[in-house]
């Protein structure tokens, strides 16, 4: 995780953060990075960060601690408290980016890598065609996080993650094709898109 709070900026956030990553890697453990000058021209963020691989879900947020630290009584108690507040979540087998979660009801969150506007257009096409759900699910909206749009469907009460693999695998090509389509939206599709956008929130 890299964050920067500074009054100085080169105007290229990608270069600024990449420079801090490179300088931070060279620091001894526990030492803070002090920045007093703007970075010289050099690698940008996309040049130093590997492309995204598989997302790994953890049952307890101890992945950022050593095993020794996680075993300390005070840390173990804090970790268990954090775990109790997490939303139970599981990846849907065979459907990239889809995650089942259980709150007051069951939902599936589908992280989409495509540009936001393309995803919204695709969802609008399916909604206008009344082909907008799978296995008795109900589209409830979308949220944005880290620049990605994440559509959300509410599932039948009690639905489990392993029940979603087949219906979502059948629905996925329809959504992919609708997102990839480049035809202008029809008036009906534009109205559907406006309804979807009105239920979109941004998580910061």
Where are these regions (language model features)?
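Alpha-helix boundary/N-cap detector
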Residues: 12, 36, 40-43, 55, ...
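Glycine-rich, often proline-containing surface loops adjacent to acidic residues and nearby aromatics
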Residues: 99-109, 146-154
